[in-house]
Amino acid sequence: MIKLNQIVKRYHTKDKDVLAVDHVDLNIESGSIFGVIGFSGAGKSTLIRMFNNLESPTSGEIIIDGDNISQLSKSQLRKKRQKVSMIFQHFNLLWSRNVLKNVTFPLEIAGVPSGLAKQKALELIELVGLKGRESAYPSELSGGQKQRVGIARALANDPDVLLCDEATSALDPQTTDEILDLLLKVREQQNLTIVLITHEMHVIRRMCDEVAVMENGKVIEQGAVSKVFENPQHEVTKRFVKDDLNDDFEDSLEYLEPLDHDAYIVRLNFTGENTTEPIISYMTKTHNIDVNILEADIKNTKNGSLGFLVIHIPHISEEHFKQFKHNLHEQHVNVEVLKHG
């Protein structure tokens, strides 16, 4: 279990004080994958660097498996960092060392005998799919291969927690998916708790059990990924979800012909089993209404499917629409009115 209690981080500059992280509270279950998303400058990278005390909080507590990180001695912190490992956006490999020696490096620091360190490193290199590349140097590797080395190195001391700071941001889409699949694989095999930082909502959708959304140093929304996608509350969250679902219909609303007074354009958001239910058939039969489909999409998450449907109902009374909306809510379908005549 990871607990963050009222975490604050201030930077003092010559001209002003900067509040990078503003009273953040988080509870992260052991064995889960927890995502933190936000735009540049939201404070997410500063936050994750406090998990292993690369940055010290100005105030507040970070407790990992019962240990208050800020209260550990230097020797205790070194040992704790072996169990709270990290991978980075730009890999942070040692360019003068080949793949094998990059992976053995943390084992050398931990005092592991060279024979055992080499054996462990070779196992990890095979695990991340780089068998045969042990003698290659970082300059000879692709971005995805470099990140695989970073993952192998991070796993060298059998960590309990893996921190991922924008680990796929420098990669192309296909390589990103390969790295995400690898992280899911190692998490399953080694029962890791993964905390990842990203500005890409599809990474959250594919990987995470829960997500926290940050803006201006604060957590503005938090919850299970499926719930946040189904019913985002904050405007920043809505923007992330909209971009990931390729839902740009609202931008086109102003170009539509004026609606009749009893017409509606609505978005239906649904998750899980609802994505395969015959919603349109249900609406037309149960409510005896005509429906035009304007836009639709379905995405897969780690724990199921989610999607949206934008429809035009050309004629429906206000009272009938209230009943229609209520019935869909009973089926766990969220209804959002985009335009009314």
Swiss-Prot record:
Its main location: membrane. GO terms for molecular function: ABC-type D-methionine transporter activity; ATP binding; ATP hydrolysis activity. ATP binds at G38, F39, S40, G41, A42, G43, K44, S45. Its EC number is 7.4.2.11. It is an enzyme of class 7 (translocase). One of its GO terms (cellular component) is plasma membrane. Gene3D superfamilies: 3.30.70.260, P-loop containing nucleotide triphosphate hydrolases (3.40.50.300). Pfam families: ABC_tran, NIL. It comes from the Bacteria. Keywords: Amino-acid transport, ATP-binding, Cell membrane, Membrane, Nucleotide-binding, Translocase, Transport. It is a peripheral membrane protein. SUPFAM superfamilies: ACT-like, P-loop containing nucleoside triphosphate hydrolases. Residues 2-241 form the ABC transporter domain. Belongs to the ABC transporter superfamily. Methionine importer (TC 3.A.1.24) family. The complex is composed of two ATP-binding proteins (MetN), two transmembrane proteins (MetI) and a solute-binding protein (MetQ). This is Methionine import ATP-binding protein MetN 1.
